[in-house]
Amino acid sequence: MILEIPKNAETILHILEKAGYEAYVVGGCVRDSILGRSPDDWDITTSAKPEQVKALFHRTVDTGLQHGTVTVLMEKEGYEVTTYRVDGEYEDGRHPKEVTFTASLEEDLKRRDFTINAMAYNPSSGLVDLFGGLEDIERKIIRCVGNPLERFTEDALRIMRAVRFSAQLGFTIEEETRKALKVLAPNLKHVSAERIQVELVKLLMSPHPDYLRVAYEAGITAEFLPEFDACMTTSQNTPHHCYTVGEHILHSLCHVRTDKVLRITMLLHDIGKPVVRKTDENGRDHFKMHGIAGEKMAAQILRRLKFDNDTIRKVTRLVKWHDDRPDGTTKAVRRAVNRIGEDLFPYYLEVQQADMLAQSDYRRTEKQERLDKVKEAYETIINEHQCVALKTLAVTGKDLIEAGYKPGREIGETLNRLLEVVLADPQKNQKEILLGLLDEK
């Protein structure tokens, strides 16, 4: 098997070999090359010690000397070069207490997480595949190297990585590896919220975001997203739905494009339903105000998982208003844009579409027609530059002060009253007309 390696990476391999050391590209770059994907990074493993690597190259950065890693700079790119190593005892379910350098490539590959990530390649000696990684790629399987209980005990983040790789590649998790996931899922408590967030986002942004189901079945989501587990066991006895809340969420994830805000919104859009669910005397379920409840819960979840404030703001607002259903008139849609926000309204339309497609077929045509009218009205509002917020109102606070108003709450209240007039009739968004309305309390 011949893999195409970037010229700079091949140069590093050649320099190391010429100096008498072994050197290979290793891990994810080998996996992705075999899969026909374009690797993000090209990592190199070598028998040379860090100080020996530094002696061979003019430009290096000490990125992880304690783990044997030196970054070699070639032109404008950096390549991590790491000495063959054996990890010592893991003291926190995440990091080895110490690492020991070794002269054996096999020992280095043996410590890696999954067989598909434990392959090395060198143009002269070809593919080194000691654990069946190539066969597992061909069979589309995620399998731990060696004993899965040991691999997941060493580093609990591998529990998330197993599901994430499965979702990114569309692979199945091998049976023994899957069993180990279930046993050791509680070890995720040793992993920081930031690291769990990174893996969750990668899973959600994958071609198979619904593989979150695998994480649920293995008891993984119970450790960091128990609110989702509650959704998986909450039925929806209503003609509008044909799935549990959780299954509806999983289906909806597949109906939005690969966008971080959209995918997280779909994950959390109905998170409030288990809390507000009421069943009437006919056995029909109702979920009134689930958007409001969901907004609060989504904020708690996103803060817990250490998401940035901008993502929290966008997602919680979309969760709050995701079930808002204006009719297709431009007047109703102007008010909806004002409520939801100009920046988020296009997202809201995509959320509504995905939500509908993950429901039952009940009144589907009618629902689609209403949504299409909303989209048309929104296009009209945008094309005609109609005012939907204070920032485009023809009158400003300064105008009101010049008209005799005192700075303070009254100005804000007056501007909002004038905005209401304009939302009802955009033709009135003219300075003279609005100033003429000031005496009409």
Locate the predicted segments by residue.
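Catalytic cores of the polymerase beta-like nucleotidyltransferase superfamily
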Residues: 1-441
